[in-house]
Amino acid sequence: MKRSKNLSKKRKILISILSILIVSIISIGGYLFYVVNKSTETLYNKTYEPIESKKAEPEIIEATKPMNILLLGVDTGNEERPDKWEGNSDSMILVTINPKTKKTTLTSLERDIYMNFGDFNAKLNSAYARGQNKEAISTIEKLLNIKIDNYLMVNMEGLSDLVDKVGGIEVTNTFDFPISISDQETDNLNQIPPGTHKINGAQALVYSRMRYQDPEGDYGRQKRQREVITKIIQKVLSFDSLSHYQDIINSISNNMKTSIPLNINNSLALLGYKDSLNTITQEQLTGEDLMLNGISYQVVNGQHLLEIQNKIRKELELPELTELKTNAITVEALNTGIKNEEPDLENQPIQDNTPKPQKEIKQHENKQFNSELGYYE
């Protein structure tokens, strides 16, 4: 097996960009949603969807303790799907936000990670297709051995629409050739000439996706992605008209589902997480290539996974783990034939670092989690 080079597919890349951007907008949303509070009821009704199938009472965010948000990017490429939220979760990023250290950590999870689902094995991203956000969250909780506080789900339509809603952005093509992806997509003729130009949403997708012509490869592409995100945030913060914010809210509400109630009660609290974006670090759970029955998987190394688990736990201010517990099929498990011990997820009440509910949420009444030790026993 070879170590994966993390060659992200185009949908995963674009959804990742949109996911990070929406988290940024949420974190500065204390002001945005506050100044347009008349729109918050519509935004709440369109975007709020709790982790369980039936809605719980809205939660009040407290920006005093670390929290995490699972970002799910849904593949909406099949035009025959009647529901734009159907499909696999082709992008999965755990965002860990610590307002005390003013730090945000983005942990990307490979969609093809080889997982054990009890009676069968399959890819990580198939969990969403079987049980949508509830199944995806439960699966990733077992993978990382942590409690996930909230989720945020986006679809592919969002990034281009959002760039257009802010009136386009200005970027600089430092190459001596136009940035284009027409060699991969012959019907996509959008390009960005050398130099500084104002680009629209369709061009922003191209600018963020090009990799093969970049001498720095994926690293160069990531720099352009960060440039796009930064420019959009700068445009959002520069607006002095409520109509601009209204357009942005409409764009978000049409392309996002989240367990975080975006209402006026949470608006000022969300603002408390803004400074956590000052320092953003990125982690990647990678694997080794494995081909089984013509299907390609990524098999994670147990030590690498344990290191990722503990990096997340450090940002959540939880004790370090010395033993790996996971539902992933690791390299060691394949070599020895010994299945990994899974965390006990039958009981999982809200941890101290979750948003505080207005009243007891019944969906957790039969669940238990060792909040002192910070892991499942």
Model-derived segments and spans:
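Amphipathic, coiled-coil-like alpha-helical scaffolding segments used for oligomerization/assembly
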Residues: 127-190, 259
